[in-house]
Swiss-Prot record:
It comes from the Bacteria. This is Putative competence-damage inducible protein. The gene is cinA. Belongs to the CinA family. NCBIfam families: cinA_nterm (TIGR00200), PncC_domain (TIGR00199), PRK00549.1 (NF001813).
Amino acid sequence: MKAEIIAVGTEILTGQIVNTNAQFLSEKLAEIGVDVYFQTAVGDNEVRLLSLLEIASQRSSLVILTGGLGPTEDDLTKQTLAKFLGKALVFDPQAQEKLDIFFALRPDYARTPNNERQAQIVEGAIPLPNETGLAVGGKLEVDGVTYVVLPGPPSELKPMVLNQLLPKLMTGSKLYSRVLRFFGIGESQLVTILADLIDNQIDPTLAPYAKTGEVTLRLSTKASSQEEANQALDILENQILDCQTFEGISLRDFCYGYGEETSLASIVVEELKRQGKTIAAAESLTAGLFQATVANFSGVSSIFKGGFVTYSLEEKSRMLDIPAKNLEEHGVVSEFTAQKMAEQARSKTQSDFGISLTGVAGPDSLEGHPVGTVFIGLAQEQGTEVIKVNIGGRSRADVRHIAVMHAFNLVRKALLSD
């Protein structure tokens, strides 16, 4: 089924509102195996909407119109669709009854003739009741094309889609997806490694998405059940993770989790809780961003003892008891400083792990180091590891954000090795 979404409303074209309905509809239709091929916005103009309906009817088998179902003169979606199809508008008894109740409970409200328009549907349409508003939706098929009209306000559209429309559109198969999350490998390298799988995909499919500091892969398949989908997705996932980088490193080493909402931080926090271990941090360039990210999750008092924000050399010396002369000798952006910061954070809080971040966020270089140079230390009972990462060509905010991601990934690897 080829679907098309037409958003009706001049306010969309003038930028007064954002068309979030199209995104919601596309997502929900994809979940039931309906492919959206076109999205269009048109103003409150009958001539232009008629022209668009003519085009849509030739190229799509499902045409969904959103907005323009209200009581005012510029709400003309149903009227225009009826004219296009050569049909009349008729009243839906259930919608009329809802109007009666609405105004009976509000005697101070004037019930004018234009209010009645909200209870009308195109002749022959199946009514789609409005759970949170007054304007009834509708669905009808003419000459092999299914037309759907939905209200514009998201608070009315969403329940109508979820509870009324989708059950009527459901077929034998649905779209099932799985998201793999990768850190430490760029999108271009990942796409190059997976070129054969991407070029030859039919079903299941995979699509890469680059985000700040990480890459996600969405694996999708159409199936009649979750079990059937899992079989296909498991095969594709293993094909992906069995691939290697140009250096011979398995992609399994870069895949840290699954799902839209998962993050490196959430993985680390949950694993610390599971293992009953604690962590503390000492931060310079990130100025507490690592600690703030940890604190975003509930129940972290059991694993997060506290930390230090030591932005200046003087505070690194004073708060962490690192001799100032040593800091001056090695520099604040150095392996030595990262090591000592991590060790002192761990020691002073009696934590299992001490993590440190020191580097150059930009826009200016520091101590001869270019912007994006970051040293990250991780102290634990077995010893201290320091890594150097280069996050060049990024904004100051991105350098700090990605540095924190590297820190979480370092902790994640340590937890997995225990």
